[in-house]
Amino acid sequence: FNLIKCAKKIMGWGTKYVVIKKAEHGSLLFFEDVIFPSPGFPLENIVDPTGAGDSFAGAMIGYLASKKKTNLSTIKKSIMYGNVMGSFAVQKYGLGRLLELTKADITKRVKQYEKMVSF
């Protein structure tokens, strides 16, 4: 199957935005003729991938819920937060790493991610 064709088909049903998660490979955002690839956050040590996708989705939806408007820019930013939170989730078994996170940890990794993807 082809992810672009899949996204176009889903958008044909009336969906404005489509996000396809690709595990450690990040995600793809589709909007009109825009395809926005977002890489996963690279980690040297991955302990357990269980829950990474749920962490991605929770962070993405949480970020969007904190904003007054939903537009392409806020959705791109929400995907970045999703990738970052998914990267924390895989660092320990279960909720271990997520339970010990601080806002400073998240902010630091978000800045690392922004630096990594900007060119």
Each language-model region and where it sits:
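Conserved phosphate-binding/catalytic region of the ribokinase-like
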Residues: 1-119
